[in-house]
Amino acid sequence: MRAHRTLTHPTIIVSAILAVALAAPAGALASKRLIIDGSTSMLPLVQKLSTAYHKAFPKIPAPKVGGGQTDIGINDVASGRVDIGDASRDPIPGVDPHGLVFSKIARDGICVITNEANPLSNLTQETVQGIFTGNIRSWSQVPGSSLTGPIDLFDREAVSGTQDAFQDIFLGETLKISPSATQESSEGLEVNAVGADKSAIGFTSFAATLNGGVHTVDYQGIPCTLTNAKSGQYGGVRNFWMVTKGEPKGEAAKFIDWITKPGNLTVRKIVSSEWIAIH
């Protein structure tokens, strides 16, 4: 008599899973959806790159991209909440969590902005430092200003990579932005605030000025334009980074490698439209 083997419920479940795995297309089960958050300055760029990546590799889920500001992205990737954190300022040894790897994907210009009612032609580094540290408080003290009243100073929040980059590039290691400045949580809010206040001054990513509404001020005699930033003439340029916990691996490595691969014309076209390509 032939023996019969009765399958238990766990055996049936495992067999079913194996059957599905064997029937699935190669790589279909291996691909996970990347979760990315962090810098609001980088958000438009990373969203465009995510869309292009999914178009190039339609079997790979498009990364889920969110904002939240640089320090939030860095802390989220360190804690494992996300796969990649976007950072719009350079690594800070002793401040950033241990074990993170920063991969540069692009560069970006930071512009000083005023209200269109106060179209300053130029600001020197000394004047920028005086204004943003609070030592210069009246427009009457600023050469070329059409105003004479108090300066309304706008800043970004402390978790902002743009704030860190602005301080490093424009103010230097020792100076800090005045605590009396009004802090905004995103570039869009910063631009809107300066655009609504004729006495205002602030700073933002070059890409955030493209829709108008504010006046971009020349810095050290050089206009804040994409062309000048690419050529190296304009000094207010910072790096864009994708941050991982340890060396990039899995889907995060594939995405970052695709972005940073020399000769990737798709990426170069996207980056060069509003930012500065690194290849």
Regions found by a protein language model. Name each.
Residues 2-14:
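Bacterial N-terminal signal peptides that target proteins for export
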Residues 12-23:
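Bacterial N-terminal signal peptides
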Residues 28-279:
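Exported/periplasmic ABC-transporter solute-binding proteins
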